[in-house]
UniProtKB/Swiss-Prot annotation:
Composition bias, Pro residues: 140-152, 772-782, 818-833, 937-957
Organism of provenance: Hippopotamus amphibius (Hippopotamus)
Renumbered residue ranges of the record's region Disordered: 1-957
PTM comment text: Prolines at the third position of the tripeptide repeating unit (G-X-Y) are hydroxylated in some or all of the chains.
Keywords, alphabetical: Calcium, Collagen, Extracellular matrix, Hydroxylation, Phosphoprotein, Repeat, Secreted
Comp. bias intervals (Gly residues): 277-286
Task performed by this protein: Type I collagen is a member of group I collagen (fibrillar forming collagen).
Name used for this protein in its record: Collagen alpha-1(I) chain
Family: Belongs to the fibrillar collagen family.
Subcellular location as annotated: Secreted; Secreted, Extracellular space; Secreted, Extracellular space, Extracellular matrix
Phosphoserine, modified sites: 87, 579
Keyword Cell membrane: no
Classification of source organism: Eukaryota, Metazoa, Chordata, Craniata, Vertebrata
Amino acid sequence: GPMGPSGPRGIPGPPGAPGPQGFPGEPGASGPMGPRGPPGPPGKNGDDGEAGKPGRPGERGPSGPQGARGIPGTAGIPGMKGHRGFSGIDGAKGDAGPAGPKGAPGQMGPRGIPGERGRPGAPGPAGARGNDGATGAAGPPGPTGPAGPPGFPGAVGAKGEAGPQGARGSEGPQGVRGEPGPPGPAGAAGANGAPGIAGAPGFPGARGPSGPQGPSGPSGPKGNSGEPGAPGSKGDTGAKGEPGPTGIQGPPGPAGEEGKRGARGEPGPAGIPGPPGERGGPGSRGFPGADGVAGPKGPAGERGSPGPAGPKGSPGEAGRPGEAGIPGAKGITGSPGSPGPDGKTGPPGPAGQDGRPGPPGPPGARGQAGVMGFPGPKGAAGEPGKAGERGVPGPPGAVGPAGKDGEAGAQGPPGPAGPAGERGEQGPAGSPGFQGIPGPAGPPGEAGKPGEQGVPGDIGAPGPSGARGERGFPGERGVQGPPGPAGPRGANGAPGNDGAKGDAGAPGAPGSQGAPGIQGMPGERGAAGIPGPKGDRGDAGPKGADGSPGKDGVRGITGPIGPPGPAGAPGDKGEAGPSGPAGPTGARGAPGDRGEPGPPGPAGFAGPPGADGQPGAKGEPGDAGAKGTGPPGPIGNVGAPGPKGARGSAGPPGATGFPGAAGRVGPPGPSGNAGPPGPPGPVGKRGETGPAGRPGEVGPPGPPGPAGEKGAPGADGPAGAPGTPGPQGIAGQRGVVGIPGQRGERGFPGIPGPSGEPGKQGPSGTSGERGPPGPMGPPGIAGPPGESGREGAPGAEGSPGRDGSPGAKGDRGETGPAGPPGAPGAPGAPGPVGPAGKSGDRGETGPAGPAGPIGPVGARGAAGPQGPRGDKGETGEQGDRGIKGHRGFSGIQGPPGPPGSPGEQGPSGASGPAGPRGPPGSAGSPGKDGINGIPGPIGPPGPRPGPPGPPGPPGPP
C-alpha cells in the first residue's frame, strides 16, 4: 500500500547527561597547504647573553602561529684564527647577570611542574550516538613542503583498552504481500532489447535520518508482472553528524627557523673534576605516553567490473487471462540499508620476549672526516706522572772558568704529550631527567598505496525456502511484450534502518609498502632535563697514536748579564738561548781533599744549556694521570719529519745521580689522532621480563577497505516444458473470472536510468562539549636494561705540558775512573762551572728495559703560573670521527596535557590511484523476486463471431 504521510516532528527532549569520552573520531583528510609565505630576513648572530638567574617555571602558553620559513643566512667566511692571548689571572666569580633577549621565533614557556595525579572520576552515562558525518569533497593535493631536519623521537603511546562490542540490531518487519490481481490479456511478443550499458557507480551519499514509518495502506489487487522500473537515484546526503568528543591536545606547532649561532666566547677556566660517583641502580621506567595521532584515511579503491550475465531462462507456462484488476499505487522503493560499522580491532597480543643478543659485529668502515669544529675549552691540567729514574751521567767535561749567572731564557717549546690516562669505571646511571616537551607533529605523510583486495569470504548458506503457495489454475501463455521505455527517475528513497552489525571479517592481505612520508619539521627544543650524576670511570681505551711534534718556537735573543740578585722563586723554563763563546781551557788543578758536605747553597739563575748527555736508561712507566674533563683541544698541524741524525758511539756509563725535583704540570698538549675503536664492551645482563601492561584503549577505526567485486548472477531455475498450441477454436462467450494463476516469472530488466547527481554536503554540525580527560594509567614496570654500547674511542691526548722551572743545580762530584756505578756519594763542595761542551753524536737507542711495576698515583701538584701565549700553530689534518657514545637513559614521561579544542575539518584529499583489479568474486546467492509491475491496459475485445471454420468432412452416404 502507499506510504502514509510523515508524522509531525516530535518535541526535542531534554539534553541527556554528558556521556563518557568516546573513541576518537576518524582523522579528517589533510587540507591543502597554503601558499608559501614570503621569506623572512636572514637571522643575525645574537650576542652571547650572560647567564641569568633561573626563573620560576611559567605556565605553558598557547602555541603561536607558525611563521614563514626564512631564507637561511649565508655562512660567513671563517676568519683567520688569531694568536692566543695571554691567559689572565682567574678573577673572582661574579654574580650571574640578567638573561639576554631571546631571538625569534616566539617564546615557549618552560614546562610546568607536574601536578598531583588526580583520582579517576566515575564514568558518566553513555551519550547518544551522533549521526554519521558527511564525506567532504576531495581537495587538490597540497604542495610538498621542504623537508626539515629530523625531529626528536616521540614518546611511545600507551596501549588502549578494547571497547565493548555493540549489540546486534534487530531485523525490521517484513512488508505485507498484496492480494494477487487478475491476469491481464496477453500482449504481443516483442524482441529482446539489447542490454544497456552499466552506469558508473555513483558517489555513496551519507545516510540520512530515518523518517517515521507511516501506516500500511490496504493491499490492492495484484497486477500483472510489468517491467521493472529504472533504478532510483541515490538519496541526498544527510546532515553532518555531531562531532565526536574532543581529542587529546595535539603537540605544539613546528618551531621557526633557528637563528645563526652566536660568536663563541672565550673559554672559561677548567673546573676541578669531581670524584666519581657511586654506581646507581637502573632507573624506573617512565610513564607511557599518550596515543599518537592516527594517520590520514586512505582513498577507497575503484569498484570492480560486473561479472558476466547468466544464461536466459526458459519462459514459464502462461496463465489464463483474467480480468484486469485495479492498478495499485506504485510502492516507494526503499533505499538499501547502509552497511554496519566495521568490527573493532581486538587488543594486540602481549609483546614477545627479547631474543638473545647476537654476536658483536665487526667494526664499521672508517667514515669520512667531518668538518673541523670550533676548538673546545681548555681542559684541566692532568696530574703529574712519576718522575723516571735519573739517567746515567755522561763523562765529565773539562773544568772551565766559572761563568756568571745568565738571565733566564725564553720559554722552551712544549714537551711531548704524556700518555693517556686509564679510563675510569662506569659511573652509576643518572636519574632520568624530566621529559622534554614533545615536538610538533610533522606533516602527514603521503597516503600509502591501497592494499590488495582481500580473499573473498565463503558463500553464505542459502536462506530457508518459503512456504509453497496454493497452485492456481494455469492461465493461457501470454506473448512477451516489447521492453518498455526507461522509467522516470524515481523519488529519493526513504533512508533504511540501521543494518545489523556485521561480524569482524578476516584480516586482509597486508598492503604494499607506502611511500615514505615527508620529513617533519624540527620540533622545539625541550626543556633541559636535570643532569644526572657523574658516571663511573670507564675502562681505558687503547692508546692513541703519538702526535707529531709541533713547530719549534722562535729562539729568543740573549740579553745582557745582570748582577746576581737574590734567589728568587723558580721561574718557567725558557727557550734555549744561543751558545756563548767557549772560554779558554784552564789548567787542571790537583785533586783536593774531600771536604765535608756543605749546606746547599741558594738556587742560582739558570745557566746556559749544557751539552746533550748520553741517553739514559729507560725509566719505569709512570702512573697514568687522571683524565681531563675538558673537551679536546684543537688538532695541531703535522710537522715535517726532521733529518735523521748521525749514529754516534755509545759513551761509558756514568754514576747514577740523584733524582731531580718533579717539574710543574704543563698545559695539555694538542690532541693526537683518534685511535682505533676499542673492543666491544661486555654484553649486559638481561633483565627480567616485566608483566604485560594492561591493554590500551581502542584506537580510532581504520579506513574502510575497498569494495568487493560484484558477485556473479545466480543460477537459473529449471526450464518449464513448453506447451503445444492447440487449434484455434470458435470464440466462446466470455467466461467468468477465473481463479488467479500462479505468479509469472520475473521479466527482463529495463534499461537502467541515468545516474543521479551526487548529494551535496550538508551543513557542519555544532562542536560538542569537551569531555573530561581520562584517568592516567599506572606507570609500567621497567623493562630489561639494554645491551651495553660499544666502548668509545679514546679521547684526544692533551697538549704537551710546559717544562717546569729548573731545579737547583746540584754539586759536581769528583771525577773518578770509569767503573761500575757505585753507591751515590755525598754531595761535594760546589766546583767551578765548566765550559759548555759540544753536542755529541746521538748514540744508538738501547734495548728497552723491563717494565717496572706501576706505582701509586701521585698527588696533584700546584698549578704553575700561566706562561705567555705561544704562536698560532698551523691547522693539522682532520682527525677521525669518534665512535658514538652510550645512549642516555630516557627521561620520565610527564603526564599528558589537557585536551585541546578540536580543529576544523579540512577538505578531503584527492582520490588515490586505482588499485589493482581483484580476483572475481564467488557466485552470489540468487536474488529475491522483484516487485510486481503495474498491470498493463486491457486490450480491446476480439471480433464476434469468429471467422467461419473449415468445411467438415462429407457425411456417410
